[in-house]
Amino acid sequence: MIELKSIFQTYKGPTGPVEALRGVDLQINPGEVYGIIGRSGAGKSSLVRVINLLNRPTAGQVLVDGRELTSLNGDALRVARRDIGIIFQHFNLLSSRTVYGNVALPLEIAGLSAGEIKARVEPLLDLVGLSALADRYPAQISGGQKQRVGIARALANRPKVLLSDEATSALDPETTRSILGLLQQINKEFGLTIVLITHQMQVIKQVADRVAVIDAGRIVESGPVIDVFTRPQHDTTRSLIAEIVPQDLPESVLARIRTLMSAGHPEEGQLLRLAFAGDESDRPLLSDVIRRFGIDLSIVHGQVDEIQGKPFGSLAVFARGAREQLNAAVAHLRGAGVHVDQVDGALPGGLAGGFSHVQ
């Protein structure tokens, strides 16, 4: 549905050229919800504005539904843009128009008759739950309702793609969940491809199928959301998901582990982080490892959550036993689909708050 090929975007800055995008390659499938996440200044908004050519890239190709937008100009580009709706953080509603009038605006510009406009606008207002507010003005409705107007307006031309540029960043958590639920409903009912630009991992966790992490204008990691959350490969990704899947252990937990490791036990101790998702969480893997390899396991920290109804989580486990048995247990867990990280350093003095990434 959407393909970006070697996209570069350079702007003029006060001290010289600024490279906002540096060789971005991206492929988004029809009907999926695709998240693009990064810190402020990473290039997220530049990327979303390239998709509909609000900003024409300095180099590279943009293809949407098989058409190369970068080869279009004038009327041909304006017609192609009707297949791409967009919603913004600050709503961008016309204060002089009612809710109905704001949704009708793109249809008026497209030249539809009053009857055709009514036939489209009324179902859209019903879809977003604003039929009773059709005659109100933006100043008379809440922020969440304004964003619902923005969504209805973005859908007015029956687009194939919906771009969401930080659309929930100005909303409270409850309203954010409501708007994301509406986007999920639209995606499922109409098969609409949705691209979510955000700095909030909670947004990605709730609705996205796949995600790309952007940093300094480059895509540094991408994949299914559940894989990226449970097996982050890049430092930027680990930092972004820390609010949902903590990457460091609390000091109180580290203190208990130091006590365990310095207890003078004759068998070796090892701290492991186990990351699991989906069906892996339903199997009695820890009890199986204890029975099979004769080692002791103590859960010292853990968290379990869900991504779109699928369980995922991580456990910090202190394992004690003979080195050969510990290695065999780790190999067994990895073979069962559990991602296992081992802490750097076997002695208390080498114990740190983070996990290494030994595969």
From Swiss-Prot:
Keyword match Cell membrane: yes
One Gene Ontology MF term: ATP hydrolysis activity
GO CC annotations on file: plasma membrane
Cited CDD domains: ABC_MetN_methionine_transporter (cd03258)
ABC transporter domain: residues covered: 2-241
EC number: 7.4.2.11
Catalysed transformations (reactions): L-methionine(out) + ATP + H2O = L-methionine(in) + ADP + phosphate + H(+); D-methionine(out) + ATP + H2O = D-methionine(in) + ADP + phosphate + H(+)
Record flagged with keyword Lipid metabolism: no
InterPro entries: AAA+_ATPase, ABC_transporter-like_ATP-bd, ABC_transporter-like_CS, ACT-like_dom_sf, MetN_ABC, MetN_ABC_transporter-like, NIL_domain, P-loop_NTPase
Binding site for ATP: G38, R39, S40, G41, A42, G43, K44, S45
Location of this chain's protein in the cell: Cell inner membrane
The entry's keywords: Amino-acid transport, ATP-binding, Cell inner membrane, Cell membrane, Membrane, Nucleotide-binding, Translocase, Transport
Chief localisation class: membrane
Enzyme class: translocase
Protein topology in the membrane: Peripheral membrane protein
PROSITE patterns: ABC_TRANSPORTER_1, ABC_TRANSPORTER_2, METN
Function: Part of the ABC transporter complex MetNIQ involved in methionine import. Responsible for energy coupling to the transport system.
PANTHER family found in the cross-reference section: AMINO ACID IMPORT ATP-BINDING PROTEIN, METHIONINE IMPORT ATP-BINDING PROTEIN METN
Family: Belongs to the ABC transporter superfamily. Methionine importer (TC 3.A.1.24) family.
Annotated protein name in UniProt: Methionine import ATP-binding protein MetN
UniProt source species: Polaromonas sp. (strain JS666 / ATCC BAA-500)
